[in-house]
Structure formats: C-alpha cells, structure tokens
C-alpha cells in the first residue's frame, strides 16, 4: 500500500492500478475501505474528507483474493511478542462476518492447500521480530495482522500485511472459543438484524473456510 497525502496522488495511484483499494489509516471492521475504479462525486468527497481528518489515504491494488486469514499475537511490556494462533475468517464487501473454530493444526492444514507451511512459519517469525522492535513496549496487549492469499500471473502468493489491528480482534475471540482437540469444525458468525449484532455458532460444514 502507498500512503497518499494529496487528492492528486490518490487519483494518480488509482489510474496506475485501474482498480484500487482505498483505506483510511485509522478505521475498524472494514468501515474505512473503498473499492474504486472510477472516482464519482461521493468517492471524491470521501477522499477529501479523509485527507482533511487523517492526513493521508493508503492506496493499494485490488488483488484477486483467494482466501482471507490472519495471525493473532500478544505484545508485552518488555517488548516481546508472542504468537497466539491462526485466524481463518470470512468477509463480505470488506467487512468481517465470521471465523472458523478449529484446532491450530486443522487451520494450518486448510491454508497449506494453497501455500507452503514454511511460508506461514517465516511470516510469523518476521512479524514477531518486526513488531517487537517497532512496538517495543509502547503498546501492551493483543493485536492481529490480517493477510490474504492472492492469485497472480505467477501463481498463488501471500499479502502478509493487509492491516494491523492493535486491539483484541474477533480472531482472538475465535481462538478462545476454538477446540483444543479435533472436534467438529464450526463457524463463529456475526450477524446484524437491523437493530443489533448477534453472534452464533454454525455447525454446517459447507459454510466453513
């Protein structure tokens, strides 16, 4: 992603990419994300408003996504970072809708259908080392890094940092509900009925990752 601090920079990047994803630096649960091919009046107003309030917009290519996933961590006051587990989740129009509840081994098996296990391990080590240096005790608590498997002309690849969430994520919630031994896999689903959000556990295997 490229940070753009002027309207002209944003337009130039969208033109370069043909179809782009625009993200506000600070947002939550997909609310600061726009998928843009052409800039209409609503998008133009949103860009100007975001630049005025937050100073810049992150612009990146629109990737041909295959799967969403993430890794969950905890950072400590001494600067160390501990890996907590994988997060396999589903989104709709960029907004989180549910997480797979399964053991770590089962989740790794799901992902290694697409990418090598060694790649997952190296990404995890890199994040632990890099975040330990960058945070260095300035933030203490849970955080998550969202990622995606994407399709390219040269095969499947990983975007290892779609965004970093310095908070307890739904991935952490899913880890606390996930089985520690092999059981029937479930989906932790978040739904909205027009008035409030509700969480439910779905056992339908066809809805899983």
Question: What is the role of each PLM region?
Answer:
Residues 1-4, 19-46, 70, 94-111:
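Glycine-rich phosphate-binding loop of ATP-grasp-fold ATP-dependent ligases
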Residues 1-4, 87-89, 187-195:
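A generic structural motif
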Residues 2-4, 10-11, 20-27, 32-34, ...:
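Conserved catalytic-core segments centered on acid/base and nucleophilic motifs
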Residues 18, 38-97, 144, 148-161, ...:
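Phosphate-binding site of ATP-dependent enzymes
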Residues 52-54, 61, 83, 95-157, ...:
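A long amphipathic alpha-helix within ATP-dependent nucleotide-binding catalytic cores
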Residues 77, 94-97, 107-109, 181-182, ...:
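Glycine/serine-rich loop-strand microenvironments at binding/catalytic pocket rims
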Residues 154-158, 166-209:
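C-terminal active-site "lid" helix and adjoining low-complexity regulatory extension at the edge
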């Amino acid at each position: 992603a490229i940070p753009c601090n002027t309207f002209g920079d944003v337009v130039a990047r969208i033109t370069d990419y043909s179809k782009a994803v625009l993200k506000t630096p600070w947002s939550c649960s997909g609310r600061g994300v726009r998928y843009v091919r052409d800039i209409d009046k609503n998008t133009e107003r949103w860009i100007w408003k975001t630049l005025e309030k937050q100073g810049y917009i992150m612009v990146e290519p629109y990737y041909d996504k295959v799967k969403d996933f993430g890794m969950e961590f905890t950072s400590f006051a001494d600067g160390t970072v501990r890996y907590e587990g994988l997060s396999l989740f589903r989104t709709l129009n960029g907004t989180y809708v549910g997480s797979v509840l399964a053991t770590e081994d089962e989740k790794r098996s799901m992902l290694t259908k697409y990418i090598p296990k060694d790649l997952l391990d190296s990404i995890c080590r890199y994040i632990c080392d890099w975040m330990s240096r960058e945070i260095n005790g300035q933030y203490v608590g849970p955080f998550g890094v969202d990622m995606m498997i994407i399709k390219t002309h040269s095969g499947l690849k990983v975007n290892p940092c779609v965004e970093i969430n310095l908070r307890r994520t739904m991935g952490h919630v899913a880890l606390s509900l996930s089985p520690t031994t092999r059981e029937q896999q479930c989906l932790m689903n978040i739904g909205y009925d027009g008035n409030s959000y509700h969480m439910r556990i779905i056992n339908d295997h066809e809805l899983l990752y």
